[in-house]
């Protein structure tokens, strides 16, 4: 019985290395396949990350372009409205000049007449509306400023120093700080 057991054991020990070798070979093959799969997965992951990065950069550029176009359109729209207001204001200046002339003539004839008072109220209302929309008259104090005044003649004046404004011949206007029309003035020249 002992011999039989030894034979059986010998028989198993001879088979074990062969099956063990097959199992090891199979495991090595699986390990290689797993390593190849891991490498392929790494390559796929790298490729995916690269493509994702490219697409993300494209998205950021397109988004930035979109925002720039949006801002430019808003600015263009705003400028178009500004230009429209400025154009209307320029078209109104002769009407304002006519009302000022009519008021001046009416006041010279009779300061207390209904016409004079009506023209005065109309001018006040007109200036209120213009001011609400950023249109205002240019002040013509004593100092001459070539940015706001246009000297169209020089006159002798005992009351004013050289270069000072003597008389406003036509009112000037500005729109949101920008000159629409300079004030036409005469300045003192006492040489």
UniProtKB/Swiss-Prot annotation:
SUPFAM superfamilies for this protein: Coiled-coil domain of nucleotide exchange factor GrpE, Head domain of nucleotide exchange factor GrpE
Source taxon at top rank: Bacteria
One Pfam family, short name: GrpE
Location (main, coarse): cytoplasm
Molecular function (Gene Ontology), one example: unfolded protein binding
GO CC annotation: cytosol
PROSITE patterns xref list: GRPE
UniProt-listed NCBIfam families: PRK14140.1, PRK14149.1
Name of the molecule in the record: Protein GrpE
Gene name of the record: grpE
């Amino acid at each position: 019985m002992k011999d039989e057991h030894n034979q059986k054991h010998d028989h198993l020990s001879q088979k074990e290395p062969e099956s063990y070798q097959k199992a090891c070979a199979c495991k090595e093959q699986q390990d290689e396949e797993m390593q190849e799969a891991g490498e392929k997965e790494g390559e796929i992951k790298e490729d995916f990350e690269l493509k994702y990065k490219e697409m993300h950069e494209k998205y950021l550029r397109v988004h930035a372009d979109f925002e720039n176009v949006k801002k430019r359109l808003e600015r263009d729209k705003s400028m178009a409205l500004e230009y429209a207001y400025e154009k209307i204001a320029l078209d109104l200046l002769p009407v304002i000049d006519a009302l000022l002339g009519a008021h001046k003539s009416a006041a010279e004839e009779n300061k207390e007449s209904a016409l004079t008072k009506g023209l005065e109220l109309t001018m006040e209302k007109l200036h209120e509306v213009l001011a609400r929309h950023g249109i205002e008259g240019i002040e013509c104090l004593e100092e001459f400023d070539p940015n706001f005044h246009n000297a169209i003649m020089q006159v002798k004046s005992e009351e004013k120093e050289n270069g000072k404004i003597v008389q406003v011949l036509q009112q000037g206007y500005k729109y949101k700080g920008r000159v629409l029309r300079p004030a036409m003035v005469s300045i003192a020249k006492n040489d």
